[in-house]
């Protein structure tokens, strides 16, 4: 069995947490030889971080790679100096390309090339979390060269999807602005009845009714507009959506909301009404920025962007080569180098497992990955190499709600994809082990029991997060499988 953890203090804690449990079980069953054997094997069990596993693999098989046998892990300080040096050389070479100059002019500010250099580093760092990242550059560039035009690139669908989400949220805000505050109108009508003369009372009541009728009509019109925006965005209708929004961009149509009349609302909930209307209007303004031009103009931009992107990707490749050479000259490897070189040992360029991979697999009855929500695509490829071809000996444990390492290129969507597609484990923990030679199936078992908190605490947490978390905010909906369940209610 191999257990892979994501950060350095975890392996020792995992080993220490298993030992007392095994001791307790073996004392309760003194005749159980299997438990005694597991206690002895625990001290030699390969529980480690993915970086430690890869480093050990490289030290044992360096001769199969183009790395020096006496390489050493690079410290952050020395690596940063090499990055700066490699980037400086890369920029000096890149500026000989007119297309890169055009890219730098587009992103740069003033006479500095800082933005261009930072973009090269951002793209490089992103790519290094992917397997076979050099091929990915060609894949990323291909849509910009596609004859199908603007609709072929990812931004077409992403912008429309974001416009649909914003329209849905804005529509809900406009609909709720007055709906949740029905008492305000009645209170103002009651105040109007306090006027001294019948004519004054009638005038005041008419003013109140006119004001709230006007507000409701504006909000209904805004909600209907946002509903149409959402409908077109979901359908992928860029041109009709742009045509619908253009009059608002040009000032030919009044922007949705309560502009000009918010000060006339004097009820108890006036701040709530104003806030919701303002937030809905702000979301509509964002939609105008998401769909800023016609499809023809966007296609012209795509054609202009393609040579600049090609020049940027060429600069990224050049930086990669220079940076790698500088590390190689000093016999240094970064943690990401460990993982990429380990993948070369375990998998051929076409994705076929190597002979060495088959040998290493034989050492493990199971591969268990903890903190899986903090995995990136490169690490996931390594786990797949270590597992059997059927993947029935690979166990992934994680919690999307605890994903906090995006800044280190962790990709929670890898875990979310499995949560969304894998069925629940039939029979739960009581499911019998499949017969030898029977192909396994991917399945998910929710470990949602909380043994640390009282029922009142669990209930309060669930109440908050059911309202706060969504796939867009928090990477997952707080529903079945994510909601906490009190594991020991009788102890409180």
Label the predicted regions.
Residues 38, 84-96:
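Flexible, charged interface-and-hinge segments in very large macromolecular machines
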Residues 22-25, 61-64, 85-90, 418-422, ...:
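Conserved AAA+ ATPase "sensor/coupling" helix adjacent to the nucleotide-binding pocket
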Residues 4, 117-333, 348, 392, ...:
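Conserved ATP-driven helicase/translocase motor core recognized via long
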Residues 46-50, 71-80, 84, 113-115, ...:
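Conserved helicase NTPase motor core
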Residues 34-41, 280-285, 421-440, 488-492:
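Short, conserved catalytic or adaptor-binding loops enriched in Gly and charged residues
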Residues 118-125, 432-439, 443-492:
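Helicase-core coupling region on the C-terminal RecA-like lobe
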Residues 1-66, 326, 330-336, 341, ...:
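P-loop NTPase Walker
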Residues 100-101:
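C-terminal helical "lid" subdomain and adjoining coupling/linker elements of P-loop NTPases
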């Amino acid at each position: 069995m191999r257990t892979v953890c994501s950060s350095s203090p975890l392996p020792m804690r995992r080993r220490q947490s298993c030992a007392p449990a095994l001791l307790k079980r073996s004392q309760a069953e003194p005749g159980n030889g299997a438990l005694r054997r597991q206690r002895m094997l625990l001290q030699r069990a390969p529980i480690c971080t993915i970086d430690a596993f890869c480093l050990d693999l490289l030290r044992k098989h360096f001769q199969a790679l183009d790395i020096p046998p006496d390489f050493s892990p690079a410290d952050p300080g020395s690596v940063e100096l090499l990055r700066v040096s490699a980037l400086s050389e890369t920029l000096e070479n890149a500026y000989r390309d007119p297309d890169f100059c055009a890219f730098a002019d587009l992103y740069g500010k003033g006479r500095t090339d800082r933005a261009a250099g930072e973009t090269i580093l951002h793209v490089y760092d992103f790519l290094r979390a992917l397997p076979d990242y050099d091929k990915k550059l060609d894949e990323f560039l291909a849509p910009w060269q596609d004859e199908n035009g603007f609709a072929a690139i990812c931004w077409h669908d992403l912008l429309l999807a974001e416009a649909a989400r914003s329209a849905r949220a804005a529509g809900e805000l406009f609909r709720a602005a007055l709906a949740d505050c029905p008492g305000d109108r009645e209170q103002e009508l009651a105040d109007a009845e306090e006027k001294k003369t019948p004519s004054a009372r009638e005038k005041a009541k008419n003013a109140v009714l006119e004001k709230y009728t006007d507000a409701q009509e504006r909000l209904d019109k805004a909600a209907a507009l946002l509903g149409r925006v959402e409908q077109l965005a979901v359908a992928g209708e860029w041109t009709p959506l742009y045509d619908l929004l253009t009059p608002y961009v040009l000032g030919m149509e009044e922007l949705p909301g309560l502009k000009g009349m918010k000060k006339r609302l004097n009820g108890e909930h006036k701040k709530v009404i104003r806030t919701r209307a303002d937030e809905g209007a702000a979301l509509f303004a964002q939609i105008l920025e998401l769909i800023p031009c016609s499809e023809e103009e966007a296609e012209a931009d795509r054609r202009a962007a393609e040579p600049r992107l090609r020049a940027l990707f060429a600069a990224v490749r050049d930086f990669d080569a220079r940076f790698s050479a500088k590390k190689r000259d000093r016999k240094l490897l970064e943690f990401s180098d460990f993982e990429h070189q380990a993948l070369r040992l375990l998998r051929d360029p076409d994705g076929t497992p190597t002979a060495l991979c088959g040998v290493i697999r034989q050492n493990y009855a199971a591969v268990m990955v903890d903190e899986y929500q903090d995995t990136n695509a490169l690490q996931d490829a390594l786990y797949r190499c270590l597992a059997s071809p059927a993947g029935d000996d690979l166990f992934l444990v994680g919690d999307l709600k605890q994903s906090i390492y995006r800044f280190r290129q962790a990709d929670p969507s890898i875990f979310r994809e499995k949560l969304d597609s894998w069925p629940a484990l039939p029979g739960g923990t009581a499911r019998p082990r499949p017969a030898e030679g029977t192909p396994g199936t991917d399945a998910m078992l929710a470990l949602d029991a909380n043994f640390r908190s009282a029922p009142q605490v669990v209930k309060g947490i669930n109440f908050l997060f059911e309202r706060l978390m969504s796939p867009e905010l928090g990477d997952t909906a707080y529903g079945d499988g994510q909601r906490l369940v009190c594991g020991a209610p009788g102890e409180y």
